[in-house]
Amino acid sequence: MMDDFITVTDVVENTFCEKFTYFSLVLGLKQYEEKRGVVISGKDLHIKHEKTNKTYLPLNIEGKKIIGMKFFSKRLSLSGKIDEAIETDDEVILIERKYTDYTDIGNTIKVQLGLLSILINENLKKPVNTTIVIFSKKHTIKKIVPIDQEILNFALNRLEYTKNIFLSCLNPTQQYSNKCINCCYRKICPVGSLYTGL
């Protein structure tokens, strides 16, 4: 049993690149997010909506608004914080905000939505059947993402893979891709540094 909780963010980062887990959780290297403009802008967006949108309910959904709540699962050794959610009589609708104009629902978002849905279900004893992802940068676009068993299974598999790297302390193999260019670990990563020239 792990002494520490893996966070949803840890698993999302593992989905983005498996070496992230090795550098951040095994070696304990900081990401220095305070030096990354997009990350700072994204956090500012979350803080803004936590403070100013306390009663706003999107798509005319009636229910109790939940903002910035952190959940834990001792069973999964997992923790995660939600941006916003609306609790109705029989379900919870999760709302995630993204500071980007890239509106594809990729694997990292699916993992995040899946794991947060599991945490909500365990803690509030209500299912998450629907999530709303709000993309905000130049434009605001809302996408509704149903939470099905495929997303939940995919998210749980990525969680187990993240734990395995953490527990084994093994550096996973990874192929170079365009995402290496903006990776915070590119200067020390044997894959990213060879191609970025840094």
Model-assigned labels for residue ranges:
Residues 4-15, 108, 171-178:
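Structural motif
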Residues 1-94, 101, 194-198:
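Metal-dependent nuclease catalytic cores that hydrolyze phosphodiester bonds in DNA/RNA
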Residues 77, 107-108:
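Short glycine/proline-enriched turns and hinge-like loops at secondary-structure junctions
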Residues 64, 68-69, 74-75, 122-198:
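Metal-dependent nuclease catalytic regions and adjoining charged, substrate-binding loops involved
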Residues 108-120:
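Short, charged, amphipathic alpha-helix that recurs within catalytic cores of restriction-modification
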Residues 98-106, 145-149:
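Short histidine-centered catalytic/ligand-binding loop motif
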Residues 7, 15-19, 112, 151-158:
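Alpha-helical structural motif
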Residues 97-101, 135-138:
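Short, histidine-centered active-site or binding-site loop motifs used for metal coordination
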